[in-house]
Swiss-Prot record:
It comes from Saccharomyces cerevisiae (strain ATCC 204508 / S288c). GO terms for biological process: calcium ion transport; intracellular calcium ion homeostasis; transmembrane transport. GO terms for molecular function: ATP binding; ATP hydrolysis activity; metal ion binding; P-type calcium transporter activity. The active site is at D445. Disulfide bonds: none annotated. Residues 7-17 have a biased composition (Low complexity). This is Calcium-transporting ATPase 2. InterPro entries: ATPase_P-typ_cation-transptr_C, ATPase_P-typ_cation-transptr_N, ATPase_P-typ_cyto_dom_N, ATPase_P-typ_P_site, ATPase_P-typ_TM_dom_sf, ATPase_P-typ_transduc_dom_A_sf, HAD-like_sf, HAD_sf. Residues 1-114, 174-349, 410-899, 951-976, 1030-1065, 1121-1173 are cytoplasmic. NCBIfam families: ATPase-IIB_Ca, ATPase_P-type. The lineage of its organism: Eukaryota, Fungi, Dikarya, Ascomycota, Saccharomycotina. Present with 98 molecules/cell in log phase SD medium. It is a multi-pass membrane protein.
Length: 1173
């Protein structure tokens, strides 16, 4: 079919076959004539051709069929009850079905599928069956004293099965908790707000509540919440995350697309096999304008409105997400510890295999020869002996495999992220929580992070007048210089009108419909400002923390907040400050803002807005071109309004307007006066804004030929418009105050004590930036005297790489910086070896946020693009939250190191003790039975992980220097403690096991009864557990004397007091109580299942006192400097030890290099300690 034939067919289809059904067929409810699939076809793929099939060449048909209005949006009687409407019943809302988590039983089954657990279960069942056979089918046996021996072997089988069940249950419970934690995190990070027009009002709603037919307002930095068709404006979108297309795509209104489609596919055009569609290129190289905004794409520049056509699972983003099965991510630390656990497991498996081979070989020698010890036993007893060997070997594997390592990091991260959320950090990427512990540099924005982001115009120079609303002046001066008084008495009505037009029309902020003015605060802009921070926090937290479908709770909370107070305007804080000034002093009435924008003719004599130029950080200004009905010569003319950074806008001004409307050409004298005013504002830490305009009286249409944009001929090129010679008139200067956040100075000083360098990166001019940096201690007296302590972004980006590296140690303030300057700063710092955290709020900050080791975006003032690019969202935009993130990052690292220290002590001791005692035993039994070992395994894996991985940050955690990138899991001081405690425990348990008969019964080993032997074995087990009990107490504090080489200097309460701040971690205290109580119960009531014989008083005292030796050993090890250990174990010895016993010879890669990324021993920061590693 030719193009004209198909074009005619499209027209015929549209005229004759438009959707006309009204019933419930195809899932369409009454009053809606389009199905979900029909609307979904518009975007998947993007097709204006499909649009024409449905709606024809008139965009108004789109609004007709979706029952919405281009300007007023959809009409809902009660916005909160949208689920009762046919619109919702027909198309749904924009929420996606939640991923169904694994049930608890599924997790139990997954935990039981562990091969070791299954082997142990099979062995337990066999042991149980053999025990029953001996009990019921074999004659009774008697000991040398003639006492009947109780047949209790079957009890051990049952006890092992119960122990396996408990281990599996605990493992499943931990996994279930982890599933819930990640589900909760995903809910928090996937929710956000969008501006929609409903009932002819702009409101903020959750993206999950967006409906088909909603008209949404999009601006730079937004992420498109659902598939929509653009109906007004112009913007650039990044669709790479959805389509993979790396180039940005310009978006135009649907009318442009329909015009191009009709033109390119007209009968007069060249023939093609099929009509051209969005993305196709005609013979002239032109494309059809793209009006289709895909859900999940990002608005990089511009602004506009779109009407929603597909939501939820019917949108492109929804279809993509439902096809994925997102599993919780593994962080680098989790992967590292999993590999470490695998390496340790190798040693356990090797030990178990050797143990089995030794015991089995001896077992064969016992049963094959006629004089062998087991030769005369019946088959069931021989089988039972073999099963004991097998169970002991399998249990060694169970104990040796440190499954608690991955669990510990999961618990530590879950605990830390939960607490960080309470402290104002929403962790989007788990690895960032770990990385913050090593941070050495923080590059922070100023606005909202170091300051409150509660902006108020406190000083200004309208024309040649001056006002001052700050409270620093005497009362009499305040009355004279009050802004309202100055505007009314000193400024002409036309100047006031032009300033009001510039502020009202040249803004994206809008009026808060829920705002209720407090009569008691009619002139209290300061009172208004005080509460902004609290409301922003409430909004931000609700935005990210809605649970399930508790919209009613959210609405109720907002209603309660509204009873107190809210800000009158929503949007950019600079723009809301200017609008507040307009309401306070320029006559803007409540509820009038949107009316003036819709009907500018009424007050301003403006026919229409012809070009909008939204603010971008790279330009530092926003602009607007309007058409006036008539000017002084009674003819229509165009006016360009501009407001932005004072020094940038004012330097392009040719004239200065006086308060009486006379113009004064700018020369060197009055230019210096203006520059001085700007400097004075900046020196007082005020943001200086210039407000200006330029008239175009000689052009009949917009834009003038000389200003026309080559790519978009219907608008003026921004560089030509702003830099056009002559004519820009400066209407006034305004100084905006943004108070420093409470406690920010202390937070910065905390970072400095912690060895973290804080740099301020801001778009403000250098004088303002330096003033604020001094106030918050970033720029101290010592640093400010140094060269290059503060510089502007334009100067910084001109430097060579080597010059940047040379000045960065002194640089603390980067002013008038662009997002590219911030990215360059981060790149240079990382190249110098720093671990860099950076904050960002704008769309253009995304590259820097991605490049940084940890990117912080603003939860209140940040764009959606910035949030998507970040690792952590600062829900309150507060710098103190970054300090908390550093604390918790360090706490995670410390908690993991504590657990590794404890785990390896128990691991080494338990495996060696079991191995040696089994081999040395004449009847091939270990001093620790399988059930006892499973109890020990429960202590060292699950309970210890809960106790040690859930600790809060130490009070002095910010007094230590950061480790940087080369932080190792196991330091010299940790290895000292591991080897010393393991040696102590082995000596104590070996003495009790091998010399117990002589110590307690004054008899040789061969002379004691089986009951006495069982008592000694039980005492060894009891001692072993109490050793771990007190070792856990030692492990809760890492070596605080690290780095102190003086023996006397290491004797301090901070280093040696293991009970310091013990009460702050209730988890630890509870678990210690559980371990101690359970051990006492086992020793009194464990009986046959735990192979326990009643202990004497002396045995109890011995066990507990021997356990306390761990505390004494801990003190001695802490006093010993690390340098002593390094000298004992030289580097060459350690490298050979790692190569052989670390199994590095098995892990060589093909190039011959060692793949030691996950090796147990890592290279340390200090040259002295490398020998020990």
């Amino acid at each position: 079919m030719s193009r004209q034939d198909e074009n005619s067919a499209l027209l015929a289809n549209n005229e004759n076959n438009k959707p006309s059904y009204t019933g419930n067929e195809n899932g369409v409810y009454d009053n809606f004539k389009l199905s979900k699939s029909q609307l979904s076809d518009l975007h998947n793929p993007k097709s204006i051709r499909s649009f024409v099939r449905l709606f024809g060449y008139e965009s108004n048909s789109l609004f007709k069929y979706l029952k919405t209005d281009k300007n007023a949006g959809i009409s809902l009687p009660e916005i909160s009850n949208y689920r009762k409407t046919n619109r919702y019943k027909n198309y749904g809302d924009n929420s996606l079905p939640e991923r169904i988590p694994k049930s608890f039983l599924q997790l139990v089954w997954a935990a039981f599928n562990d091969k070791t657990m299954q082997l142990l279960t099979v062995a337990a069942v066999v042991s149980f069956v053999l025990g029953l056979y001996e009990l019921w089918m074999q004659p009774p046996q008697y000991d040398p004293e003639g006492n009947k021996i109780k047949q209790v072997d079957w009890i051990e089988g049952v006890a092992i099965m119960i122990a396996v069940f408990v281990v599996v249950l605990v493992s499943a419970a931990n996994d279930y908790q982890k599933e819930l934690q990640f589900a909760k995190l995903n809910k928090k990070k996937e929710n956000r707000k969008i501006i929609v027009i409903r009932n002819d009002q702009e409101i903020l709603i959750s993206i999950h509540h967006v409906l088909v037919g909603d008209v949404i307002s999009l601006q730079t930095g937004d992420v498109v919440p659902a598939d929509c068709v653009m109906i007004s404006g112009k913007c650039e979108a990044d669709e790479s995350s959805i389509t993979g297309e790396s180039n940005t795509i310009q978006k135009f209104p649907v009318d442009n697309s329909l015009r191009d489609f009709k033109k390119f596919n007209s009968i007069d055009s060249h023939n093609h096999s099929k009509p051209l569609d969005i993305g196709d290129v005609n013979e002239d190289g032109n494309k059809i304008a793209d009006c289709m905004l895909i859900s999940g794409s990002r608005i990089l520049s511009g602004l506009g409105r779109g009407v929603i056509t597909s939501v939820g699972i019917n949108s492109v983003y929804g279809q993509t997400m439902t096809s994925l099965n997102a599993e919780p991510e593994s962080t680098p630390l989790q992967l590292h510890l999993s590999q470490l656990a695998d390496n340790i497991s190798v040693y356990g498996c090797v030990s178990a295999i050797i143990l089995f081979l030794v015991l089995f070989t001896r077992y064969l020698f016992y049963i094959i020869p006629e004089d062998g010890r087991f030769h005369d036993l019946d088959p069931a007893q021989k089988g039972s002996k073999f099963m004991n060997i097998f169970i002991t070997s399998i249990t060694v594997i169970v104990v040796a495999v440190p499954e608690g390592l991955p669990l510990a990091v999961t618990l530590a991260l879950a605990f830390a992220t939960t607490r960080m959320t309470k402290d104002g950090n929403l962790v989007r990427v788990l690895r960032s929580c770990e990385t913050m512990g090593s941070a050495t540099a923080v590059c922070s924005d100023k606005t909202g992070t170091l300051t409150e982001n509660v902006m108020t115009v406190v000083r200004g120079f309208p024309g040649n007048s001056k006002f001052d609303d700050s409270k620093s002046l005497p009362v009499s001066e305040q009355r004279k210089l009050n802004s309202k008084k100055v505007f009314e008495e000193n400024c002409s009505s036309s100047l006031r009108n032009d300033l009001l037009a510039n502020i009202v029309l040249n803004s994206t902020a809008f009026e808060n419909r829920d705002y209720k003015k407090n009569d008691k605060n009619t002139n209290g802009s300061k009172n208004m400002s005080k509460n902004l921070s609290f409301l922003d926090k409430c909004k931000s937290r609700l935005s990210f923390f809605k649970k399930g479908n508790r919209e009613d709770d959210e609405d109720q909370l907002f209603k309660n907040v509204n009873k107190g107070r809210q800000e009158p305007f929503i949007g950019s804080k600079t723009e809301t400050a200017l609008l507040s000034l307009a309401r306070l002093s320029l006559g803007l009435q409540p509820g009038e803002l949107q009316y003036l924008r819709d009907q500018p003719m009424e007050k301003f004599n403006i026919e229409k807005v012809v070009q909008t130029i939204p603010f971008e950080s790279s330009r530092k200004w926003a602009g607007l071109v309007v058409k006036y009905k008539e000017g002084k010569n009674k003819k229509p003319f165009y006016r360009f309004f501009i407001k932005g950074a004072a020094e940038i806008v004012s330097k392009n001004c040719s004239y200065k307007r006086n308060s009486d409307d006379t113009l004064e050409e700018i020369n060197e004298d009055n230019k210096k006066e203006t520059d001085d005013e700007i400097k004075n504002l900046a020196s007082d830490a005020l943001r200086a804004i210039s407000v200006a305009h330029k008239d175009f009286c000689e052009c009949d249409s917009w834009p003038p030929e000389q200003l026309r944009d080559k790519d978009s001929p219907n608008i003026a090129a921004l560089d030509l418009l702003f830099n056009s010679q002559k004519g820009l008139i400066l209407d006034g200067l305004l100084g905006i105050q943004d108070p420093l956040r409470a406690g920010v100075r202390e937070s910065v000083q905390q970072c400095q004590r912690a060895g973290v360098t804080v740099r301020m990166v801001t778009g403000d001019n250098i004088l303002t930036a330096k003033a604020i940096a001094r106030n918050c201690a970033i720029l101290s007296t010592d640093i400010s005297s140094e060269a290059y302590s503060a510089m502007e972004g334009t100067e910084f980006r001109k430097l060579t790489k080597n010059e940047r590296i040379r000045i960065l140690p002194n640089l603390r303030v980067l002013a008038r910086s662009s997002p590219e300057d911030k990215r360059l700063l981060v790149e240079t710092l990382k190249g110098m070896g720093d671990v860099v955290a950076v904050t960002g709020d704008g769309t253009n900050d995304a590259p820097a946020l991605k490049l940084a080791d940890v990117g912080f975006s603003m939860g209140i003032s940040g764009t959606e693009v910035a949030r998507e690019a970040s690792d952590i969202i600062l829900m309150t935009d507060d710098f103190s939250a970054i300090v908390n993130a550093i604390k918790w990052g360090r706490c995670v690292s410390v908690s993991i190191k504590k657990f590794i220290q404890f785990q390896l002590i128990v691991n080494i001791t338990a495996v060696i003790l079991t191995f040696v005692s089994s081999v040395a035993s004449s009847d091939e039994t270990s001093v620790l039975t399988a059930v006892q070992l499973l109890w020990i395994n429960l202590i060292m894996d699950t309970l210890a992980a809960l106790a040690l991985a859930t600790d809060k940050p130490d009070p002095n955690i910010m007094d230590r220097k950061p480790r940087g990138r080369s932080t190792s899991l196991i330091s010299v001081s940790t290895w000292k403690m591991i080897l010393s405690q393991a040696t102590l425990q082995l000596i104590v348990t070996f003495i009790l096991h091998f010399y117990g008969p002589e110590l307690f019964f004054k008899k040789h080993e061969d002379e004691i009864t089986s009951h006495q032997q069982q008592q000694l074995n039980a005492m060894t087990f009891n001692t072993f557990v109490w050793l771990q009990f007190f070792t856990m107490l030692v492990s809760r504090k890492l070596d605080e004397g690290d780095g102190i080489s003086n023996w006397r200097g290491r004797i301090s309460a901070a280093n040696l007091n293991f009970f310091q701040d013990l009460g702050r971690n209730y988890y630890f205290l509870t678990i210690m109580a559980i371990i101690g109580s359970c051990q006492v119960l086992i020793m009194f009531f464990g009986g046959a299942p735990f192979s326990i014989a009643r202990q004497t008083k002396s045995m109890w005292i011995t066990a507990v006192l021997c356990g306390m030796l761990s505390l004494i050993m801990g003190v001695l090890v802490r006093i010993c400097p690390d340098e002593v250990a390094v000298k004992v174990f030289p580097a060459a010895f350690v490298q050979r030890f790692k190569y052989v016993f670390g199994l590095e010879f098995l892990r060589k890669n093909h190039t011959g290099k060692h793949d030691d990324e996950e090796a147990l021993l890592e290279e340390s920061d200090s040259p002295e300690s490398t020998a020990f590693y």
